[in-house]
């Protein structure tokens, strides 16, 4: 048995999402790229490659990882490329997308004949949290002025639009896309490809897949463009758990269970977005606050109920631990970093990466 803590990726659950993605590809004509900023655990890329067209990135290292480990199309994007990295980025990508016109003007000559794009910020989004809203005031994410974009349109092959965030509502997606068309239609007609980014929760049960595919197909036909999608969370939703063990039990107005993991170090977005972790099979008469083991007072996974009183050594599965977890894990407090394990279709589990004190030491100097 693998020692806790560890991330457990269920390949059967991952396959369910990938089959939805493949259905969207086939029915809409869109190409689908994995957003490495969300999930970059390359030990399952052999499965994902069969259902996706490539990767999209936010940095030089992600570009290289996508090119070397995933294959297919490799799209390079960054909020700001640096002089010392641009040539290496170009060497590992198939398309390069610039965040601003100034970046485009500075570096487009380095890209040679490779397709070039620009991030288009339509100024509207569905983000409910200001921290993640690309349309927030004074946003640095992309260009909004149609006239400025048209000034370089003859040098552009495509644009990337990323203004959805955990959007589970097709009608909201449709409305946002319509706003983009109304303001930027002249630009769209002069491109060969358009990426609609990520944040579209089309693998969520009950999502209007039929309407979604038809909308993508119609958009592609209207503007004669290849549509790209860049799912991250939608790819790995409900595929991964963080397996932890209870290491202490206490009471301070409520029952407290301290586990051998941490939100700050292992599921950081719970803190950033003030969310509560879903606890698997958490129902019963015995309520506990599930606490992380760092010194941070607010290192709390959430509340859960259990059929029996918890004991030291009991294992707990914390759900939805695939997106923005392994790519953000850190060594805060020197807490043991979770291993990464894979559950195969036959139910067998194998560890693919384990971390040690040597990894902690080598991450510092």
Curated annotation (Swiss-Prot):
Pfam families: Orn_DAP_Arg_deC. Keywords: Cytoplasm, Decarboxylase, Lyase, Polyamine biosynthesis, Pyridoxal phosphate, Spermidine biosynthesis. It is an enzyme of class 4 (lyase). Its cofactor is pyridoxal 5'-phosphate. GO terms for biological process: lysine biosynthetic process via diaminopimelate; nor-spermidine biosynthetic process; spermidine biosynthetic process. SUPFAM superfamilies: Alanine racemase C-terminal domain-like, PLP-binding barrel. Its EC number is 4.1.1.96. Substrate binds at residues 233, 269. GO terms for molecular function: carboxy-lyase activity; diaminopimelate decarboxylase activity; protein homodimerization activity; pyridoxal phosphate binding. Homodimer. Belongs to the Orn/Lys/Arg decarboxylase class-II family. NspC subfamily. Catalyzes the decarboxylation of carboxynorspermidine and carboxyspermidine. This is Carboxynorspermidine/carboxyspermidine decarboxylase. It comes from Herminiimonas arsenicoxydans.
